[in-house]
């Protein structure tokens, strides 16, 4: 049983699908066929040299830097999360410094003394995740004595009336001192800020001494038009552009503000160029701006420019 015949409308096999934007040396001057038929002719023509690699296929096999086929090694956490400290570590150790800030009450002192003093925390097993020291330095136990030793007035309120009545320190029985961990955040003291806030430092655009200084800075390689610019031997491009822009600014200032005595007619430099206003009109397809021509309609380009020329003559006759 024979396979069904393919319609002539379809491109014969083998062929490339449209969308390839590469370079075909043989496709330069071929016209009249579709892309598929042309590529089919090139692929079946024995006189055309072909590469063993297809155009749409990658030229080389992609190289993978990382091998994903092997299993990954087990994750090893950082030593800081496992060990309490690192050998030879010389950085900050919180709760390192001790201070004698108060005494235990008598019953607690006896209990602490019977357990062995400083080795209490090492003998009592602590649950996992337990912080042996509070996150903030605790307040020492209050002492009924001089109110100046209590510090903040809130402590005096907490101790009651006896802290306010007696001013002489009360005699206390000798007992074991309680050790507290005091967190010391050692940092240099902040300098007194005396300067006022300078709002000008937050300006995004720089403060320029010359107006339009950003537009006057030319970039090397710029091929656009620079007025009054001329190539001078031995002068840098940026210096030449700066000098040309200075001359252009001066000429524009004199053009807008001509020098003439009071009562005299304005000089010829005040008027626009004579190439715009001519009696014979301008040629069509002129894309420049022609003053007093925007209100004209139902006229050709030549008649519109002639009418603009007449309006300009009338305006000059009414001006000094």
Curated annotation (Swiss-Prot):
<keyword id="KW-0963">Cytoplasm</keyword>
<dbReference type="GO" id="GO:0036064">
    <property type="term" value="C:ciliary basal body"/>
</dbReference>
<dbReference type="GO" id="GO:0030317">
    <property type="term" value="P:flagellated sperm motility"/>
</dbReference>
<keyword id="KW-0206">Cytoskeleton</keyword>
<dbReference type="GO" id="GO:0036126">
    <property type="term" value="C:sperm flagellum"/>
</dbReference>
<keyword id="KW-0966">Cell projection</keyword>
<comment type="similarity">
    <text>Belongs to the CIMIP2 family.</text>
</comment>
<dbReference type="GO" id="GO:0160111">
    <property type="term" value="C:axonemal A tubule inner sheath"/>
</dbReference>
<protein>
    <recommendedName>
        <fullName>Ciliary microtubule inner protein 2A</fullName>
    </recommendedName>
</protein>
<comment type="subunit">
    <text>Microtubule inner protein component of sperm flagellar doublet microtubules.</text>
</comment>
<dbReference type="InterPro" id="IPR052683">
    <property type="entry name" value="CIMIP2A"/>
</dbReference>
<dbReference type="InterPro" id="IPR018902">
    <property type="entry name" value="CMI2A-C-like_dom"/>
</dbReference>
<comment type="function">
    <text>Microtubule inner protein (MIP) part of the dynein-decorated doublet microtubules (DMTs) in flagellum axoneme. Binds to the intra-tubulin interfaces.</text>
</comment>
<keyword id="KW-0282">Flagellum</keyword>
<dbReference type="Pfam" id="PF10629">
    <property type="entry name" value="CMI2B-like"/>
</dbReference>
<keyword id="KW-0969">Cilium</keyword>
């Amino acid at each position: 049983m024979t396979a069904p015949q393919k319609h002539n409308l379809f491109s014969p096999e083998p062929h490339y699908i449209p969308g390839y934007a590469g370079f075909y040396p043989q496709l330069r001057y071929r016209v009249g066929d579709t892309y598929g038929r042309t590529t089919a002719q090139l692929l079946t023509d024995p006189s055309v040299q072909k590469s063993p690699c297809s155009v749409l296929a990658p030229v080389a096999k992609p190289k993978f830097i990382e091998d994903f086929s092997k299993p990954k090694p087990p994750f090893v956490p950082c030593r800081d999360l496992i060990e309490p400290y690192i050998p030879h570590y010389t950085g900050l150790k919180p709760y390192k410094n001790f201070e004698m800030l108060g005494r235990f009450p008598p019953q607690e002192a006896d209990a602490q003394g019977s357990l062995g003093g400083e080795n209490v925390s090492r003998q009592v097993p602590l649950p996992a995740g337990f912080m042996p020291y509070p996150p903030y330095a605790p307040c020492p136990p209050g002492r009924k004595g001089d109110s100046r030793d209590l510090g903040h007035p809130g402590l005096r309120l907490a101790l009651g009336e006896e802290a306010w009545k007696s001013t002489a320190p009360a005699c206390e029985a000798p007992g074991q001192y309680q050790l507290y961990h005091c967190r010391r955040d050692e940092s240099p003291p902040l300098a007194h800020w005396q300067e006022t806030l300078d709002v000008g430092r937050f300006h995004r655009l720089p403060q320029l001494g010359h107006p339009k200084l950003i537009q006057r800075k030319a970039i090397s390689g710029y091929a656009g038009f620079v007025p009054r610019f001329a190539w001078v031997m031995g002068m840098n491009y940026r210096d030449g552009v700066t000098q040309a822009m200075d001359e252009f600014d001066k000429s524009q200032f004199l053009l807008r503000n001509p020098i003439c005595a009071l009562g005299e007619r304005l000089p010829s430099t005040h008027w626009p160029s004579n190439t715009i206003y001519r009696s014979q009109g301008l040629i069509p397809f002129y894309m420049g701006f022609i003053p007093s021509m925007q209100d004209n309609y139902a006229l050709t380009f030549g008649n519109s420019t002639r009418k603009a020329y007449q309006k300009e003559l009338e305006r000059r006759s009414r001006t000094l």
